[in-house]
Amino acid sequence: MSEPVVDNVTNKVEKMEVKEKTSAPPKEKKEKKSNKVQLKTPKGTQDYNPRQMTIREQVFDGIKQVFKRHGAVTIETPVFELKETLTGKYGEDSKLIYDLQDQGGEICSLRYDLTVPFARYVAMNGVLNIKRYHIARVYRRDNPIMTKGRFREFYQCDFDIAGTYDLMVPDAECLVMICEILEQVKVGDFQIKLNHRKLLDAIFAICGVPADKFRAICSAVDKLDKSPWEEVRKEMVEVKALDGAVADKIEKFVSLKDEPIKLLQHLRATGMCDGNKDATEALSQLETLFGYLECFGVTQHILFDLSLARGLDYYTGIIYEAVLTGQDRVGSIAAGGRYDGLVGMYGKKDVPAVGFSIGIERIFTILEDEYKKENKKIRENATQVFVVQMEKDLIKERLAIVSELWKAGINAEFSYKVNPKLPAQLNTADESNIPLIIIIGKSEVETNSLSVKTMHDRKQVSIERSNFTVKIKEILSTIPK
């Protein structure tokens, strides 16, 4: 007897539903979210490994020697300042200042340079004269180019002379110091481009630039070291709304650059600046400065360049910028000038000042590249002696020797293993470029002596154990550095 039709259909539907259930794709497993943080430094910053830090410390030490040789003292200021302290000091570059989030207290910003904090320090503490250097980090929201030494966090090395002194004497010393520092760090041939802010303003006035456009046009001229005149002129006319004929007059001036005395004589002979009080005063000051620089013997490094503008608003006198010649890898490696009105912005009394900043990060970039090309070996530590044991069970003897070395002011290391293998100890000393090793074995213990080996020539001698540190110092003094 056949099954009822209804029952047949029901059975088929039930079977289909079962089939669909069994053939349904398995539910996707939810991927576990990773709690790992991406490890990287913020844009425009970087870590420095021991090799890099060795180079940096050597350069810093050399620069400090120059600062101290000229009688400078050092100060320290906070890494962040009240925002109002920094506002209105940097012209168009003010947009690069890092503002800190308001935490319900004072509105602060990270320092943009070391000059403005120095001026605030002088005004706040009633300082009337000081010759100071300051090496510290500064911060800028710039577009970083790490390969060219442009960062958002970087070191500056500043030197400034604040106080009322005879005309151009401190200014000349600053330029001499830049020459000494750049020769000390051995970055190659360099040139210091020099101009006078009053002369630049006089040129603008002579050419017909409206007074309210001086700073804007100055900012445009400041780009001539990176951009051709056509682009700068376009900015002046189309962006700054300067008359094209006025821009063409400016070109005749800013295209002039020559040896200091030659260009000075040319400007006077042609009468290009006649009749302008600021120009006359600036040329007189520059003549005095060039005479002092001749006495110091550094005029071969100076280029009188009327296109040099320096965009910072606080400059009032001479301005200068050092660049490397014969290569286009980095921008300026030092810059500065006179700023007689900056301190007065913070206090009742003006304190004239002049100074400069070394572009230390760019110098580091150059030196690191050169070391890589030449495959130079760099000692990452200052260890002078490595203490080695020949046989087992001499850890206490090693510790006693190292202890005496440390007490004698000698930099020393040893293996942290109780019974290290001799080849491993020698390899450590060799790879770390440690110049001297002291070897202790059972025979040395019995004879109350030590074996000493100089690594540069592989010579080995035996010395007495008693008062051995005196002999070690003698040997170290003969090793080539």
From Swiss-Prot:
Localisation: Cytoplasm
Keyword Nucleotide-binding assigned: yes
Entry GO CC: cytosol; mitochondrion
Superkingdom of origin organism: Eukaryota
Protein name, per record: Histidine--tRNA ligase, cytoplasmic
Primary site of residence: cytoplasm
Enzyme class: ligase
UniProt keyword annotations, A-Z: Aminoacyl-tRNA synthetase, ATP-binding, Cytoplasm, Ligase, Nucleotide-binding, Protein biosynthesis
InterPro entries per the UniProt record, alphabetical: aa-tRNA-synth_II, aa-tRNA-synth_II/BPL/LPL, Anticodon-bd, Anticodon-bd_dom_sf, His-tRNA-ligase, HisRS-like_core, HisRS/HisZ, HisRS_anticodon
Catalytic activity: tRNA(His) + L-histidine + ATP = L-histidyl-tRNA(His) + AMP + diphosphate + H(+)
Catalytic activity, EC: 6.1.1.21
Stretches for region Disordered: 1-48
GO biological process terms on file: histidyl-tRNA aminoacylation; mitochondrial translation
Gene, per the UniProt record: hisS
Biased composition (Basic and acidic residues): 12-31
PROSITE patterns referenced in this protein's UniProt entry, alphabetically: AA_TRNA_LIGASE_II (PS50862)
A GO molecular-function annotation: histidine-tRNA ligase activity
Entry similarity comment: Belongs to the class-II aminoacyl-tRNA synthetase family.
